Regions:
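Conserved N-terminal catalytic core of the sugar/cofactor nucleotidyltransferase
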Residues: 2-5, 13, 26-27, 31-108, ...
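A structural signal for short hydrophobic beta-strand segments in well-ordered beta-sheet cores
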Residues: 25, 148-151, 222
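Short beta-strand-to-loop element that shapes/binds the nucleotide-sugar donor at the catalytic cleft/hinge
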Residues: 131-148
Length: 320
């Protein structure tokens, strides 16, 4: 079995924090986001991190630092988000370039999952078709923001992308298993949509469309788990994921006469004086004085003074 970890996006929703760093390499507790995925895949024959040329060296440095002997980097042929081949397009290109002919895991590298991968693989081996990990968001209003799976038992009956009236609360996550015989679904899917009026940037960049199409061609199954799942694409998602993996706040910097609320993460070398902070992440070597910081991420080497900040993303070396 092989795995492809998708890490080629430019994460524009978290810019400027992720403008010059790959989102899967952001710290989550004591290690990068992607490490939570890869440490569970040590027994696989090979894991390929699919990324772009801009971040390829960063991922190679990560592999070397964490001594991931079964992991290597494959570079997508694009530099900007506009040139990106799309999630499905990147997988198809990789299948062609690497001539992959094996059972395959496809995993979003910027997600955090708390389930045990070996349990998931045991489940997959008992099935005779692709499996999509799903998560019950338990709220119909929340379900409108996800690709939603409707099931009959554990078999996929329908898939709807961000429905106004969700048929269930089971959200499709970026974690898929394809047995060797079904890896060809990617090429069949591409061939099908090439003959339609659907723009390539739609059918090659929306994984939900593959599920929507493929479940009518073959039996597809769901694996549901209890625990936590976070798609780390927003400030709130990042803060909630951080809170899930650590016990309480992380305060590695200095605080003086400051009110530290819940879900606060202050990294090495940073200082807070006369400041109120809650639901926020402050990267290393940043100074915050006489301010209120809520639901925000402040990058390294910033100087913030006398500022009321809410729902903000502040890039490195910023002075406010």
């Amino acid at each position: 079995m092989k795995a492809v970890v998708l890490a080629g996006g430019h994460a524009t929703r978290l810019w400027p924090i992720t403008k010059d760093r790959a989102k899967p390499l952001l710290p989550l507790g004591k290690k990068p986001i992607i490490e939570y995925i890869l440490e569970d895949l040590e027994d696989l024959e090979e894991v390929i991190i699919s990324t772009n040329d801009k971040f390829a060296e960063d991922f190679q440095d990560y592999i070397d630092e964490y001594n991931r002997e079964n992991v290597r980097v494959a570079v997508e042929s694009q530099q900007s988000e506009e040139e990106k081949p799309g999630t499905i397009g990147a997988i198809i290109n990789l299948l062609d370039e690497e001539d992959i002919d094996d059972d395959l895991l496809v995993i979003g590298g910027d997600n955090y999952y708390s389930f045990n991968t070996s349990d998931f693989l045991d489940f997959c081996r008992r099935k005779e078709g692709p499996v999509n990990v799903v998560y019950d968001v338990k709220d119909l209003d929340l379900a409108t923001g996800f690709g939603i799976v409707d099931t009959e038992g554990d078999k996929i009956k329908d898939f709807v992308e961000k429905p106004e009236q969700p048929p269930s609360t089971l959200a499709s996550t970026a974690f898929y298993y394809f047995p060797r015989k079904d890896v060809e679904l990617f090429h069949k899917y591409e061939k099908h949509f090439k003959d339609t009026d659907v723009p390539a940037d739609k059918y090659l960049d929306e994984p939900g469309r593959l599920i929507e199409w493929a479940h009518e061609k073959t039996d597809m199954f769901t694996y549901s788990f209890d625990g936590d799942w976070y798609d780390i694409g927003t400030v709130q998602g990042y803060v909630e994921a951080m809170s899930s993996v650590v016990d309480g706040n992380i305060i590695k910097g200095d605080t003086e006469n400051s009110d530290i609320g819940e879900n606060v993460f202050v990294m090495e070398g940073s200082t807070l004086k006369n400041t109120t902070v809650e639901n926020s992440i402050i990267f290393a070597n940043t100074e915050v004085n006489d301010s209120e910081i809520r639901n925000s991420i402040i990058d390294k080497f910033c100087e913030i003074e006398d500022t009321d900040m809410k729902n903000a993303l502040v890039g490195e070396h910023t002075t406010l």
